[in-house]
From Swiss-Prot:
Organism: Saccharomyces cerevisiae (strain ATCC 204508 / S288c)
Composition skew (Acidic residues), residue ranges: 93-114, 121-142
Region Disordered, residue ranges: 27-148
Stimuli inducing this protein: Up-regulated during cold stress and following nutrient replenishment by dilution of cells fron exhausted to fresh minimal medium.
Protein name per its UniProtKB record: Protein BFR2
InterPro entries membership: AATF (IPR025160), AATF/Bfr2 (IPR039223), AATF_C (IPR012617)
Other noteworthy facts: Present with 15400 molecules/cell in log phase SD medium.
Amino acid sequence: MEKSLADQISDIAIKPVNKDFDIEDEENASLFQHNEKNGESDLSDYGNSNTEETKKAHYLEVEKSKLRAEKGLELNDPKYTGVKGSRQALYEEVSENEDEEEEEEEEEEKEEDALSFRTDSEDEEVEIDEEESDADGGETEEAQQKRHALSKLIQQETKQAINKLSQSVQRDASKGYSILQQTKLFDNIIDLRIKLQKAVIAANKLPLTTESWEEAKMDDSEETKRLLKENEKLFNNLFNRLINFRIKFQLGDHITQNEEVAKHKLSKKRSLKELYQETNSLDSELKEYRTAVLNKWSTKVSSASGNAALSSNKFKAINLPADVQVENQLSDMSRLMKRTKLNRRNITPLYFQKDCANGRLPELISPVVKDSVDDNENSDDGLDIPKNYDPRRKDNNAIDITENPYVFDDEDFYRVLLNDLIDKKISNAHNSESAAITITSTNARSNNKLKKNIDTKASKGRKLNYSVQDPIANYEAPITSGYKWSDDQIDEFFAGLLGQRVNFNENEDEEQHARIENDEELEAVKNDDIQIFG
């Protein structure tokens, strides 16, 4: 089909000035085809002018740049000429470089863990070795052996350091666990001591002599006797178990020297005397071990805190070793024993008056007997009234029981333990509360950023805002139902508040006022000047 005139004109108008070549066209494929022979291509053949011309046949002719002409650049300078080469040689160089890079990466991966723990001196040595190897052009076998030996040494050092760190962490963890166990044991002992305080107080009420015990048994019932026997068995069992525990403990820590005798004592039934004897022997063996342990740990604590270095605080009581402090406290044993014999609760044992009157208590002499022996002259002064009699006291006895050698009362020591325990509980509670307060404060700060839940319709008095007042604790309103004021008293009270006086004879005032008015009217009539029919 022939083209119309308009199509022919448009083809001529659109036709480009320079001829366009399609690289995918088979006719023009020879222009863009590279013929390689023996590893050499046509691109590397600069002598073939025909190929150059064919390749540049579709280029436009452009004049030289003015800038290039001004600067006078000479592109034909021999320094800009390249070196002849082939693709095969290029590929061989690339493959060699890739192999070297892979080997270096493998070696770096092997030595990465070891080289991470190098010191500065080792890094400098390695850098010097690398520079020498680069200068030589390759690594020798000796350098590889040295590097291998160095990596082994570094690995060994890292393993030792890791083992030391793990051992120190385990040691610290075991110390912390042992400290927690010690504090738990100490708290349990204090709790047990506090629970036994009631039993210690009740034991002071028991009879003091065998005669009073026999007399009490005669008055007791069968149930009471049975309970006494059961308590005696439990008491002996408890003491035997305590002594066996102490023997095992001292054998385990090598405190007891004679192990065979100690093992023989484990399976032995003891009487009351034997219990006291073995308790004393165990205490004497434990004393040396206790002083050594206290001295050891007190010196460690003082050296860690740095108090030992200060000469001014060296001789203070609180900075002395723990064993010395214990010995100082126990040195005045008579004073400590006297404090335990103070009868702070005014407890009187059963049949105490009778035992004292019959002279069964040699450590305690009745003031009645003492006055009769010493003061024969004052026999008429009333021997039944003791010297320590105080009429202001409700519980006056015939005997001075403020200091009783047959009573054991360590309430002052018990109160110290109780106060320490309470302070510890309070401090723990405060710590937990402070942690909770910090958590709540952080939550409050985070909540401040959020939109608050506010009732927008509660403004301008449309809703009444109120809060319920808590009831007053331990408050009771006065009850006035038993006695009430009369109306006259109420009027007089309020009139007195206002500074006035109230006359309660209201009828008499009215009569007097009427009488005065009548008298005034009579006088007015008498003094009138108007006369009728005068």
